């Protein structure tokens, strides 16, 4: 599945869309809205198509929507583990088949298969748990970063990039294409680098993110599904950051995706997405991520491995 990124780099200022104001989030009403066909069988539509492929985050989010419809109201997802096994066809709807693997008193497991052309393109297992108190609790400390109110959004950053007289000629077309796309999430990078000065960077990035529009407090299951969508955004691109000054992306897709849900949160409120890549090699990259609430609570942990094939970066002086 495709993993969106900024033009020829891995930073999380990829795409934007016009905010719907006070309207209910388009992620809930359209992007993650499934059509029930039969018991435990659903059809998804309304696909965002970056790089002519289905966006992996949308498939993960829709699969979790399907799984959540088969469990009781008093249980919530605590983990999911997914594999992308075939490229999705953006011209066709996706069928989601849910298997009720186990329903227990505390934990329940659901297996979800996403199907096109009669073959699975994606498989997922999600585990749900009833809320339970525990005296054993700890978490890492949230990174200290500027609040989202002090940072520029991607729309403003793209305008600044396009006005930069030192911007390399290969970027304006890609930036204008990005600016024309509509994406149902808002992004504010913590430390965006100028595109005119590609340089070696640490395989780490942070950005504030939230769903556009209003989701509300009532449905925690939907907030988890929206977070699943958000979690794949520019995630794998973190592995590119140390290499973007000498290589450009030839091919990049997600192989798998895992998430662990720790605490309640609202996906329509700002959360800090902390991403890092501890390893890359063998035409693969590994990335880890943490979604933090603004009050410092660790809400979600993510991990992903993907295929990354690159070509040498050709300087404009050699063109």
From Swiss-Prot:
Pathway: Lipid metabolism; fatty acid metabolism. Homodimer. (Microbial infection) Interacts with human immunodeficiency virus (HIV-1) Nef (via middle region); this interaction enhances ACOT8 Acyl-CoA thioesterase activity and occurs in a Nef myristoylation-independent manner. According to a second report, the interaction with HIV-1 Nef occurs in a Nef myristoylation-independent manner but does not enhance ACOT8 Acyl-CoA thioesterase activity. A motif (Microbody targeting signal) lies at residues 317-319. Its main location: other. It comes from the Eukaryota. Catalyzes the hydrolysis of acyl-CoAs into free fatty acids and coenzyme A (CoASH), regulating their respective intracellular levels. Displays no strong substrate specificity with respect to the carboxylic acid moiety of Acyl-CoAs. Hydrolyzes medium length (C2 to C20) straight-chain, saturated and unsaturated acyl-CoAS but is inactive towards substrates with longer aliphatic chains. Moreover, it catalyzes the hydrolysis of CoA esters of bile acids, such as choloyl-CoA and chenodeoxycholoyl-CoA and competes with bile acid CoA:amino acid N-acyltransferase (BAAT). Keywords: Fatty acid metabolism, Host-virus interaction, Hydrolase, Lipid metabolism, Peroxisome, Peroxisome biogenesis, Serine esterase. This is Acyl-coenzyme A thioesterase 8. Detected in a T-cell line (at protein level). Ubiquitous. Signal peptide: none annotated. Induction: Regulated by peroxisome proliferator (such as Clofibrate), via the peroxisome proliferator-activated receptors (PPARs). The gene is ACOT8. The active site is at residues 232, 254, 304. It catalyses: choloyl-CoA + H2O = cholate + CoA + H(+); chenodeoxycholoyl-CoA + H2O = chenodeoxycholate + CoA + H(+); acetyl-CoA + H2O = acetate + CoA + H(+); butanoyl-CoA + H2O = butanoate + CoA + H(+). GO terms for biological process: acyl-CoA metabolic process; alpha-linolenic acid metabolic process; bile acid biosynthetic process; dicarboxylic acid catabolic process; fatty acid beta-oxidation using acyl-CoA oxidase; fatty acid catabolic process; fatty acid derivative biosynthetic process; long-chain fatty acid biosynthetic process. It is found in: Peroxisome matrix. Its EC number is 3.1.2.1, 3.1.2.11, 3.1.2.2, 3.1.2.3. GO terms for cellular component: cytosol; peroxisomal matrix. Changing residue 78 to A: Reduces Acyl-CoA thioesterase activity and peroxisome proliferation. It holds the Pfam family 4HBT_3.
